Amino acid sequence: MLQITLLALCLISVDRAKAQDWSHFVRTAGHGLQIDNISATIKDASSTYLYGIEVDNDIPGRYESFLDPTEKLQAIKAMADSAHAIKNHAFVYIAGLEIITANSDTARHTFFKDHPDWVQRNVKGEPAIFGGGDAFWITKGDEDAWITPYALEWRKIYMERIRQMTATGIDGIYIDIPYWMCHFKGWQDSWASFDKYTVAAFRKKTGINALKQVKIGDWNDPNFISWVNFRKSAISEFVSEVKENMKSVNRACKLILEIYPGLSEAEARIGTDNYQLYKIADVITHEYSPRDQAYKDGGGGNSARSNPLGWMRYMIAMFTFRAMAEEKPTWMLSYSWGGEEKINPSDAMKNLFVSQVMSGTNSWDAARHVMSGSNDYDTRKQVYKWINDNEQLIYTKREPMSPVGVYFSPNTRDYFSDSWERSYFGTMEVLMQKGIEFEIVTPRTLDKSKSGLLLIPDVRSLGEEELGRIETILKEGKKHVVFTGQTGEYDSSRRKVDKDRIKSLVQAYKENTTFIEDDPGSDFDKFMQWGYDVSMYKDRELEYQNSRSYEELEETLSKYYLPSVEIKGGGGCVSQITSVKGKPTVYIANFTGLKSKENAIPIPERDMSITFKNLPNRGAIVNFIPFLEKSVQLKGVWNKNDLTVSLPSFLRGVILTLSD
């Protein structure tokens, strides 16, 4: 009876979401796929409230099925039919540019033995071939090969397999990171691939000989910049062809792309640029987790090892991914617990899930550092049921009201990654600490940004087209624009330009611009790394010793930011102020007291108040929805058309929204 009830609840939610795109409501976990385990997978999905079921039988990533996919195609079709029978959806995992041959040490035929010219190579000509121990998913005796997308015979077969999988009726094809091999030990600085096909394609496109005319790793070499951009374009073109082949068979089938890591030089290094690829893929899954004291890009780490600043930066990253995605969903393949002795797996999972809920991203439950299983099935069931019950509030598009805009520059991220990361994250940390409504603005959304105040933090690479659009905004007089640091000193190809072009713009539009010579974002990030975690372990306010640049930024914020919602208190919280279906809504996650490997239970937030300003209806009611709990209504105090509520104590997070 219990199983029937759970399934019925799941089906009700699925029916409710069916009118919208299913990929926006996914809460998933991974499963192997054989004909004889489909019923167990369906049972797991039904009993733990999965919506969108991942299965893995990887046709093109295993040499045997790359050659003959018949048996695996039958299993994919059976899985799709079974998922549809319970009004759910399923998607199948496949490799991108990686292929494994089992038992290669005894096999007569392996991918590399049969096709040595199809694999990626470093500048010395050494092939990207690996074995057991090089990565946890490679079994001893197996051959792991990395393929160039310019091996056209392989590519033709790959696209045929894509069409065959799509024809099974599966709802999505999930492609594991298609990247140039700059990941495994000894290959991080390879800037591969220098195989004959890739080198020839680069020379045809640019006239440059990659083997002789590119200074590998030299960001001041224009030929190296051309190589970097060519490699990114090559991956994007490959993914575009995959999508074309999928949609030629079934336009409803989703292209789901996994990407690692996220916001660092690594995008340029491996060639898989999430900003570019959001234009192509239907969904991007970010393999990206909270970090501990390293605070660098979140490719590694897990929830149990993260400190409060790591959590804040993880949420800033997710907000950035959501800005890149625009109307598309963002899935997070993040890890919660890896055996940390002092941490209860359930607590680590709840911290991870609450951060994803409050950022509007979709959750993927996984055991340890793999894509399948769970560290605690009861916790998954509890959380996924709560998400199921509140999915419309969590995943309906969040609209800005009166935000401060922060400009995200993909080129600056690639070309000046270290300084960019400090400035960008530090600027966002300022807004997080002050409880200010924010809007992350990208080159694609610059013209439709709703912010009245736009911060451009040390955006060193700024193209003429971007600069022209910023000047158009200034001419319209609708925004105040703040330039900081070395903004605009390089063009979109990293060529040094007139350093005074930003100052000339500021001079021409004095009333609508501010130029801060130093970089307040970097200054604030240094301060946060110095003292934030120590303060939040003990729930103490952190007093910032102002720098001159920070004072200039603070003065500009106080002058030009006119809030729709004001937040007081919550120094260890990360908040997003937004509008959902026309109603002011606030999402809050609490990380106070969390400590890497030591404590995963937050100190409850007890001293926080929120003021909703200039409301049109004095009869508005505040709905208070704590994470994993039921909604309750709060009474507030009116001052003219402003409504202030003192929040009850909450542990991990809360959603507040208004109703009439």
Residue spans of the language-model regions?
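Sec/Tat signal peptide C-region and signal peptidase I cleavage site
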Residues: 15-19
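Catalytic domains of carbohydrate-active enzymes, especially glycoside hydrolases
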Residues: 35-62, 167-172, 283-284, 352-359, ...
